[in-house]
């Protein structure tokens, strides 16, 4: 019996008890919360349903809890139901009911934990979207890991998800990039506002290999040649780095296309129809302050050129026209102002501002022995995705970046994350999977096959803890997807790995010496097989490998 099964049982029992006593069953919440007590002595699960309902139905919460506990105690699978404090209900499950989760996991396989909770959503998930003026920096690397994991997580809950990279190839930064390449090709110093790093010299050399006569071209053609070829080369490198990191996108949208295709003009025309565009001081303004922004925004500047937000407006409309009902933007720490701005754009088009969700990621620092690390020569003073992968590997890099809430700055200790020790969280989880894989190989050599026929024998405390943790996985995924918090999957996996290691140290799984295999051995083997499956499922969501050997 999983927590979801128990919650449904509790709700149905409460509905029957309330009806029997002439109380209002309509007061029942749509979702009943069942949690594991911090103190295992209080039971396997606990609920505060009676405390929630008491006042609503005109009953004393503790008395109501007593009615519910009495009814639950008569239910198959419930070993005991007791009232605690002002109206909590503590529940213990029978071993056979608790162990059903093993069968659930093995039957579902790599789909265990999946649901249709987000199936009504068609989501555009935009992340990374770094400027094509240099390698992916460490902040963008965090989004590459978290965004990819979030996309996988939302997919497990039934959402349609398109992962999208918005390619910022329009504007002043591209002009500075081209100027930097030209200076490098000529052997001149980097312009004052230009881009530095050996990658600029590398790209400039590649441009000259593709266009040997570029430096002899007139200025407009010279600049366009270095801009076009340089941006293409840089973006190719970015995509290769992301692919090697395990992050790929379904769609790449070019900002420049918003302007050259006329979509900016079309979007502004649509906004004029809503009455939310006006002219002032020779410029064209969007009335965003009417929709929660701190001020109105210039859309077309007085010189006739589109402001930066013009591209954002066209891009939002483009997403909606492609059929997305939810647009998630993952932005850097310096983009807090964009939250109100993007929601105001949605509202100006007549959409619910909730159509837009903005996640803001905080800073990432690399440390070794407590001291900041400066690594990259290729990108000047910037730490890049490639630097991090070179230092600790793809798995550790992804896991370390996903493991903390995105609104929390993080320090990545390179010594810790590259160590083969239990203090390294990704090693700890992966080692549990490798240990389980070795156990499966050893069992096969003995001719033992996991068997779910006698799961009621799994009555040891450590077995019970492991079973309950396995049962939590679907709820963890559902909650993590709903809150857009893939770090919850990391923390769950660490708890599961810990529960498994403690179980393994206390409960012998395989027969030793001349000992004959028993039903308990094969039941424990089934429990181990289920644990291995759930760890693999969780790591897959994170884009981290589940090694067979370590």
Curated annotation (Swiss-Prot):
CDD domains associated with the record: Anticodon_Ia_Arg, ArgRS_core
PROSITE patterns: AA_TRNA_LIGASE_I (PS00178)
Molecular function terms from GO: arginine-tRNA ligase activity; ATP binding
Single GO BP term: arginyl-tRNA aminoacylation
Swiss-Prot/TrEMBL keywords: Aminoacyl-tRNA synthetase, ATP-binding, Cytoplasm, Ligase, Nucleotide-binding, Protein biosynthesis
CC annotations in GO: cytoplasm
Superkingdom of the source species: Bacteria
Keyword Cytoplasm in record: yes
Short name of one Pfam family: DALR_1
Catalytic activity: tRNA(Arg) + L-arginine + ATP = L-arginyl-tRNA(Arg) + AMP + diphosphate
Subcellular location: Cytoplasm
InterPro entries assigned to the protein according to its UniProt record, in alphabetical order: aa-tRNA-synth_I_CS, Arg-tRNA-ligase, Arg-tRNA-synth_N, Arg-tRNA-synth_N_sf, ArgRS_core, DALR_anticod-bd, Rossmann-like_a/b/a_fold, tRNAsynth_Ia_anticodon-bd
EC number: 6.1.1.19
Keyword Ribosomal protein part of the UniProt annotation: no
UniProt motif ('HIGH' region) ranges: 130-140
Subunit structure, as described in the record: Monomer.
Family: Belongs to the class-I aminoacyl-tRNA synthetase family.
Protein name per UniProt: Arginine--tRNA ligase
């Amino acid at each position: 019996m999983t927590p979801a099964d128990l919650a449904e049982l509790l709700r149905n029992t409460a509905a029957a008890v309330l009806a029997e006593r002439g109380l209002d069953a309509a007061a029942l919440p749509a979702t009943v919360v069942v949690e594991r007590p911090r103190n295992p002595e209080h039971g396997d699960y606990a609920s505060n349903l009676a405390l929630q309902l008491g006042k609503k139905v005109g009953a004393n919460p503790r008395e109501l809890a007593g009615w519910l506990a009495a009814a639950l105690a008569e239910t198959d699978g419930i070993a005991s139901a007791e009232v605690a404090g002002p109206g909590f209900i503590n529940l213990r499950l029978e071993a056979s009911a608790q162990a059903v989760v093993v069968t659930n996991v093995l039957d579902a396989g790599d789909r265990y934990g999946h649901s249709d909770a987000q199936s009504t959503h068609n989501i555009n998930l935009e992340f990374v979207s770094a400027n094509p003026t240099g390698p992916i920096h460490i902040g963008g690397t965090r989004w590459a890991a978290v965004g990819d994991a979030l996309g996988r997580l939302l997919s497990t809950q039934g959402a349609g998800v398109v992962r999208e990279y918005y390619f910022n190839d329009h504007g002043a930064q591209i002009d500075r990039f081209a100027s930097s390449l030209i200076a490098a090709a000529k052997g001149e110093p980097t312009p004052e506002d230009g881009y530095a790093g050996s990658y600029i010299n590398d790209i400039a050399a590649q441009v000259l290999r593709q266009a040997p006569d570029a430096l002899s071209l007139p200025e407009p053609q010279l600049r366009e040649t270095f801009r076009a070829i340089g941006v293409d080369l840089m973006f190719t490198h970015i995509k290769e780095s992301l692919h090697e990191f395990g992050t790929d996108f379904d769609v790449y949208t070019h900002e420049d296309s918003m302007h050259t295709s006329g979509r900016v003009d079309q979007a502004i025309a649509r906004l004029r129809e809503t009455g939310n565009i006006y002219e002032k001081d020779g410029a064209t303004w969007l009335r965003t302050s009417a929709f929660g922004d701190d001020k109105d925004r210039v859309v077309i500047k007085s010189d006739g050129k589109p402001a930066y937000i013009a591209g954002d407006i066209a891009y939002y409309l483009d997403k909606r026209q492609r059929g997305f009902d939810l647009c998630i933007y993952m932005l850097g720490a310096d983009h807090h102002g964009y939250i109100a701005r993007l929601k105001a754009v949605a509202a100006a088009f007549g959409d619910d501002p909730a159509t837009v969700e903005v996640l803001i990621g905080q800073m990432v620092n690399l440390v070794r022995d407590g001291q900041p690390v400066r690594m990259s020569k290729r990108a000047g003073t910037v730490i890049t995705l490639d630097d991090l992968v070179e230092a600790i590997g793809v798995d550790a890099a992804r896991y370390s970046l996903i493991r903390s809430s995105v609104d929390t700055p993080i320090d990545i200790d390179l010594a810790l994350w590259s160590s083969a020790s239990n203090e390294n969280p990704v090693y700890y989880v992966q080692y549990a999977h490798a240990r389980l894989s070795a156990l499966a190989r050893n069992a096969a050599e003995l001719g033992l096959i996991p068997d779910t026929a006698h799961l009621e024998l799994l009555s040891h405390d450590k077995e019970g803890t492991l079973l309950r943790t396995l049962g939590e996985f679907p709820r963890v995924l559902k909650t993590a997807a709903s809150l857009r918090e893939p770090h919850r999957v990391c923390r769950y996996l660490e708890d599961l790995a810990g529960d498994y290691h403690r179980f393994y140290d206390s409960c012998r799984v395989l027969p030793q010496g001349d000992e004959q295999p028993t039903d308990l051995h094969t039941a424990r083997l089934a429990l181990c097989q289920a644990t291995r499956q759930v760890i693999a499922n969780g790591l897959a969501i994170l884009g981290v490998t589940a090694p067979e050997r370590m």
